[in-house]
């Protein structure tokens, strides 16, 4: 018979606490016999049980331009309006690369990094460990969570992964500050895996971009939000990880185009996109889908116009901050055409030619979004749960927390899509396509190769479960 929720009892169920808790004083006195882990967690883990838990964390922090350091340090005990959480997975975003390149100059940095380093990573998923008193009616320890990092607090750009000392995705444990909950940006995640939770944020960026599109009616000042239903849509440089998600969303969301053209200049990337999201799948949903390599086309604008029956496009998305691509997008917009500049540049002076004659006489307009909002991430989670979106196609590499610094700094030079990090693991960044070759000398990768081959070389719950169980701990 256990008469109190003492430290040793908790450690028996959660070994990670053995070396990481500094103060673990039980206040409540539940009396219970041996119970299943789930019941034990429910009895022990409410924050009222503890007078503060001081947790050690390992995290990658940014100190300045390309100055990323994997460090171990102690998190303070949480306050009544905070939540202690365990991060399991984080997917590396190009925005983190841009943050590392810009350092203090980045718009989301709120204080001098050399004196106030921030934990990087904002596409993360994990479990709640200790819930402050203020939030115990809404959240419980043991719940899985996803997060909407674009807080928009008081009109600022502050966000986890950019602006905070104790919260970011590339860490083992974090403290979720009050504003995340106050703004409705901590979301319960009910799936049986973690990697899809990490993908919900990048998916929400695409969802938000589609919702940000708008069109007008002559003689009216009302903006009709969204792409033109049944219209024509061009995704330029659109077969990277975010482009793949945009194709998936364009085909499967309720407001679809009638014609969708996707361009790139890399045959291998185009072939992978077409194999994952084939024109036959789009046709089932009433969308004509065409993939085009524009690399060797002398006049890509004319070719893309020809593919659209000689007409220009209602909606154009630009997925690369490249001047000729932006200008191609401008030239493709038809009457009342909306150009979405999706890819954020690192150069504050980045610019391109834009036809203002057409702004005046053809009602052209341009939009840009930086992340989705909370409704967008909820829509993403909902569509993913129903199987309407399958963003796992974005994942091409997996690795451990020890790989984050090099991966973020060199992200623009590493081919493929999303790099998925498991934060409690020490594991070289490895492409799924390379598992079989590495498996010739490493049984761990040999087994992973067999698992991903069963799912058409895509990451899966089975692969994640195997990695979490067998990959070396950090």
PLM regions: where:
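Short, Lys/Arg-enriched N-terminal segments with co-localized hydrophobic residues
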Residues: 37-54
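Glycine-rich beta-strand-centered segment in the early N-terminal region that forms part
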Residues: 76-91, 105-151, 168
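NAD(P)H dinucleotide-binding glycine-rich loop of Rossmann-like/cofactor-binding domains
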Residues: 149-230
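C-terminal hydrophobic helical "lid"/dimerization subdomain
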Residues: 217, 223, 297-305, 311, ...
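Adenosine-nucleotide cofactor-binding segment
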Residues: 230-231, 236, 247, 251-325, ...
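Hydrophobic/small residue at the entry helix of a nucleotide-binding pocket
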Residues: 241-242
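ADP-ribose/adenylate-binding Rossmann-like module
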Residues: 315-320, 334-349
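Rossmann-fold NAD(P)-binding glycine/threonine-rich loop
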Residues: 343-362
């Amino acid at each position: 018979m256990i008469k109190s929720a003492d430290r040793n009892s908790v450690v028996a169920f959660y070994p990670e606490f053995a070396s990481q808790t500094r103060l673990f004083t039980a206040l409540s006195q539940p009396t219970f016999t041996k119970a299943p882990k789930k019941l034990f967690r429910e009895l022990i883990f409410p924050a009222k049980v503890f007078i503060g838990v001081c947790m050690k964390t390992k995290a990658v922090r940014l100190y300045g331009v390309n100055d990323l350091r994997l460090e171990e340090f102690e998190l303070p005990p949480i306050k009544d309006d905070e939540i202690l959480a365990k991060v399991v997975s984080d997917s590396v975003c190009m925005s983190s690369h841009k943050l590392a390149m810009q350092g203090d100059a980045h718009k989301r940095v709120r204080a001098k990094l050399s004196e106030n380093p921030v934990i990087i990573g904002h596409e993360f998923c994990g479990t709640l460990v200790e819930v402050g008193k203020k939030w115990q009616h809404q959240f419980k320890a043991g719940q899985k969570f996803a997060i909407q990092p674009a807080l928009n607090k008081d009109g600022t750009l502050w966000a986890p992964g950019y602006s905070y000392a104790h919260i970011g995705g590339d860490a083992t444990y974090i403290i979720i500050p009050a504003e995340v909950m106050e703004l409705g940006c901590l979301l319960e995640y009910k799936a049986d895996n973690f990697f899809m939770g990490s993908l919900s944020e990048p998916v929400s960026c695409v969802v938000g971009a589609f919702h940000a599109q708008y069109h007008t009616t002559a003689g009216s000042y009302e903006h009709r939000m969204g792409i033109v239903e049944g219209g024509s849509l061009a995704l330029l440089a659109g077969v990277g990880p975010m482009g793949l998600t945009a194709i998936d969303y364009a085909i499967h969301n309720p407001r679809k185009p009638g014609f969708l053209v996707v361009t790139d200049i890399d045959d291998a990337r185009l072939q992978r996109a077409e194999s994952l999201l084939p024109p036959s799948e789009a046709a089932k949903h009433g969308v004509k889908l065409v993939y085009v390599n524009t690399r060797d086309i002398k006049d890509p604008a004319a070719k893309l116009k020809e593919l659209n029956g000689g007409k220009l496009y209602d909606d154009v998305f630009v997925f690369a901050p490249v001047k000729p691509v932006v200008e191609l997008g401008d030239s493709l917009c038809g009457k009342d055409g909306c150009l979405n500049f999706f890819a954020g540049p690192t150069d504050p002076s980045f610019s391109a030619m834009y036809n203002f004659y057409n702004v005046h006489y053809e009602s052209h307009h341009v939009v840009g979004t930086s992340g989705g909002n909370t409704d967008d991430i909820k829509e993403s989670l909902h569509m993913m749960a129903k199987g309407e979106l399958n963003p796992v196609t974005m994942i091409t590499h997996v690795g451990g927390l020890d790989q984050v610094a090099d991966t973020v700094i060199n992200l623009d030079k590493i081919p493929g899509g999303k790099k998925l990090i498991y934060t409690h693991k020490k594991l070289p960044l490895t492409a799924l396509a390379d598992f079989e070759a590495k498996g010739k000398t490493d049984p761990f990768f040999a087994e992973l190769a067999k698992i991903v081959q069963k799912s058409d070389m895509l990451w899966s719950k089975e692969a994640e479960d195997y990695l979490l169980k067998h990959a070396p701990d950090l």
